[in-house]
């Protein structure tokens, strides 16, 4: 039984081919002979690609932890007004509703299943010699998978636990840091964050010397996406959990805590922009015909999931049914007619409602991707985290982001901290549409949700644990308090 990964922990594998996008083509298997899989470096590579593909499942980042459930909770859509909408109950925070319970349960199970696959791979790596791999690949895989495990845990923490400011000592979630059949105990938020940061710090150390994403050749945008036929795995680094993505994730974690270190990590990524590793998206790339439009602003992406079928799950470009994601309040969200996002990334669907085209069926390398961490978030984090220390710089960062979105209005030098946070919040809402981040922003700050400012209690900000976890896993939900 040791050498089988059974249905409870389905290991996703795929074949590495010569194209940087071929890791999308994955065959899930109910059970895989682990010894055979991990008998070659290519087997380890396939297991890494399989983790990414598992993350594109509709129950998590393929839909519900991005543009689906999490953005419904953030009140982006008309779902909150339409009782016939299949996600109406979710929009009302009716967590006891059957549909909502199923979404939450599947989100939990698939996330921890994917974490288990990370742990299977990490356990195998511990028993393998670095010399078994091409030079540098052992550290690359180890760092990458450590960071992916941290990424998954952090989103579970943000979704289910009280915010850091409400109760950082809450006994809330398991941190599954090894593979086994034991029931992991719930840990305090502080314990989980400490484990997250340890994993991410380790990942950065492992990745920096070997990751092509930090080499000078990466300053040529073409090299973000080109692959080396001799080693596809080492060369296709643009969207994977690379060094910059790990740095951005650390900024996100410290921002969640309200720790000034958030500025340090966010600023490191911003400096990478200054040094040529990233580029803001010009209007010409956004105003191109829809089929070739840069809908995800690819040169600003730190981490994304490749998923060629995303447009099949995102019905909005052909909006006509109750499963669509019609945006509520577009004119209020993008009041400036000059805002590139309002001009080029939102359109009218068949039913006449305005919808995003971020996941439209774009027939180019600019589509079929789900942004997980982007450059713009680093500007928002640095601006908020650095406001008290350097107000002028914080204002300049927000103005720079807005200028690169077509908004030229200056921000008053006398703006208050409260008003500045309001400006950051609306800018975040414009940026994060379809990406599942905005609900966490409101929760972190304890703000009313959406353009209509719906009051949400601390308890409602916490997703309830699946009933099976409480009943059979001996979990407590005592931390969920009004």
Where are the regions that the model predicts?
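Bacterial Sec-dependent N-terminal signal peptides
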Residues: 1-29
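Membrane-proximal, proline-rich intrinsically disordered regions
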Residues: 20-71, 307, 409, 448-482
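Aromatic-residue-lined binding/catalytic grooves and analogous aromatic/hydrophobic interfacial grooves
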Residues: 21, 212-215, 243-278, 480-481
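Conserved, well-structured interaction surfaces
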Residues: 45, 85-160, 182-190, 205-207, ...
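Inward-facing hydrophobic residues that define packing positions of alpha-helical scaffold repeats
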Residues: 48, 115-118, 193, 200, ...
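Hydrophobic-face positions in mid-chain alpha helices that act as interaction patches
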Residues: 218, 222-229, 233-241, 260-375, ...
């Amino acid at each position: 039984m040791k050498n089988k990964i059974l249905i409870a922990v389905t290991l996703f594998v795929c074949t590495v081919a010569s194209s940087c996008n071929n890791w999308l083509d994955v065959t899930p298997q109910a059970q895989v002979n682990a010894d055979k899989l991990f008998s070659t470096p290519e087997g380890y590579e396939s297991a890494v690609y399989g983790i990414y593909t598992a993350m594109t499942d509709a129950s998590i980042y393929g839909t519900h932890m991005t543009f689906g459930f999490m953005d419904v909770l953030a009140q982006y859509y008309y779902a909150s007004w339409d009782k016939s909408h299949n996600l109406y109950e979710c929009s009302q925070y009716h967590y006891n509703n059957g549909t909502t319970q199923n979404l939450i349960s599947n989100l939990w199970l698939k996330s921890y299943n994917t974490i288990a696959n990370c742990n299977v791979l990490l356990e195998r790596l511990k028993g393998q010699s670095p010399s078994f791999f091409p030079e540098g690949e052992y550290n690359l895989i180890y760092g990458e998978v450590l960071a992916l495990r941290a990424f998954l845990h952090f989103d579970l923490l943000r979704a289910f636990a009280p915010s850091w400011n409400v109760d950082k000592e809450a006994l809330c979630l398991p941190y599954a840091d090894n593979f086994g059949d034991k029931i992991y105990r719930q840990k305090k938020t502080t314990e989980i964050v400490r484990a997250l940061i340890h994993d991410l710090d380790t990942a950065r150390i492992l990745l920096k010397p070997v990751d092509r994403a930090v080499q000078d050749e990466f300053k040529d945008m073409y090299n973000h996406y080109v692959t080396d036929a001799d080693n596809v795995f080492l060369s296709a680094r643009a969207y994977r959990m690379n060094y910059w993505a790990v740095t951005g994730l650390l900024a996100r974690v410290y921002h969640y805590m309200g720790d000034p270190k958030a500025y340090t990590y966010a600023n490191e990524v911003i400096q990478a922009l200054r040094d040529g590793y990233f580029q803001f998206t010009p209007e010409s790339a956004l105003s191109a015909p829809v089929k070739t439009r840069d809908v995800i602003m690819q040169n600003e992406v730190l981490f994304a999931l490749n998923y060629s079928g995303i447009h099949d799950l995102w019905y909005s470009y052909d909006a006509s049914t109750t499963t669509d994601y019609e945006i509520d309040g577009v004119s209020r969200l993008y009041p400036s007619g000059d805002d590139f996002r309002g001009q080029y990334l939102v359109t009218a669907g068949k039913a006449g409602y305005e919808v995003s085209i971020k996941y439209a069926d774009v027939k180019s390398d600019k589509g079929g991707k789900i942004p997980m961490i982007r450059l713009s978030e680093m500007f928002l984090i640095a601006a908020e985290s650095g406001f008290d220390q350097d107000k002028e710089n914080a204002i300049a960062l927000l103005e720079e982001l807005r200028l690169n979105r077509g908004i030229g209005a200056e921000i008053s030098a006398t703006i208050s901290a409260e008003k500045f946070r309001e400006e950051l919040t609306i800018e975040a809402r414009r940026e994060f549409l379809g990406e599942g981040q905005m609900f966490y922003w409101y929760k972190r700050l304890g703000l009313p949700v959406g353009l209509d400012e719906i009051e949400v209690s601390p308890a409602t900000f916490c997703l309830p644990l699946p009933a099976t976890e409480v009943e059979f896993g001996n979990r407590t939900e005592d931390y969920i308090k009004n």
